[in-house]
């Protein structure tokens, strides 16, 4: 059955518009530099690999916060400072340092131009489990809204965050196209909510056999923009 033209789009951010791990590594180094200067005992006790392990441990201890990376990070920092004998007053400044670096991203080569093309034709909701700041990154004007797992209280692939996107955009599930890189979080999550999906498969990966396939698949966001322009062209105005 042909995919009907969408009335709106929802778009994942991390690993869809930019690669996330270089960004996280950059932020981890910025945090460690801050701690080395302001809280050297914490920096010595928690080098980057150990701080990463601590964050995973904290996340495991607080499964009810699986949707909130910000609180997970702050709890990790508070634990590290307390354990090392430094003052927990530094938690917010340490987090702010990490977060500023987390928002210094490098777009995939095609992503920004493709986003501009899509935003010129459809209302778009950013739909993310992460905590990127679209204003800091400079792309907030391309989106109608940024819907986060933290704000909704549910993370992808759970249906409530997808339903929230539909409600916010004022469309039915069958009128939304969700776009993202993750087979489970984006594609299977959208399918469970009755929403069509486009898999952005930048690494030419094989589709997991145990998941429902995407409705569309492209190697880049530009590929999706090209397909939509061809499949659903703008009509020229009547003279």
Short names for language-model regions:
Residues 1-9, 21-22, 86, 112-125, ...:
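Asp-based, Mg2+/Mn2+-dependent phosphohydrolase catalytic module
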Residues 2-109:
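N-terminal helical cap/lid subdomain that shapes the substrate entry/recognition surface
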């Amino acid at each position: 059955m042909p995919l009907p033209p969408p009335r709106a789009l929802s778009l994942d951010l991390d690993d869809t518009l930019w690669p996330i791990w270089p960004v996280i590594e950059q932020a981890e180094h910025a945090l460690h530099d801050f701690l080395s200067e302001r809280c050297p005992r914490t920096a010595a006790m928690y080098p980057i690999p150990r701080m990463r392990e601590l964050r995973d441990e904290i996340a495991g201890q607080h499964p009810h916060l699986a949707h909130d990376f910000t609180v997970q990070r702050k709890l990790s920092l508070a634990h590290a400072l307390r354990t090392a004998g430094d003052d927990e007053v530094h938690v917010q400044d340490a987090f702010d340092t990490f977060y500023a670096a987390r928002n210094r991203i490098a777009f995939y080569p095609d992503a920004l131009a493709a986003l501009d093309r899509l935003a010129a034709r459809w209302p778009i909701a950013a739909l993310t489990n992460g905590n990127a700041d679209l204003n800091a990154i400079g792309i907030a004007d391309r989106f109608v809204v940024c819907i986060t797992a933290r704000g909704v209280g549910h993370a992808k692939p759970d249906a409530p965050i997808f339903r929230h996107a539909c409600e916010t955009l004022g469309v039915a599930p069958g009128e939304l196209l969700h776009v993202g890189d993750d087979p489970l979080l984006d594609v299977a999550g959208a399918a469970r909510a009755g929403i069509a999906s486009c898999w952005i498969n930048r690494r030419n990966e094989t589709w997991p056999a145990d998941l429902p396939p995407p409705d569309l698949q492209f190697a880049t966001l530009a590929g999706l923009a090209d397909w939509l322009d061809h499949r659903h062209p703008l009509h020229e105005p009547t003279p």
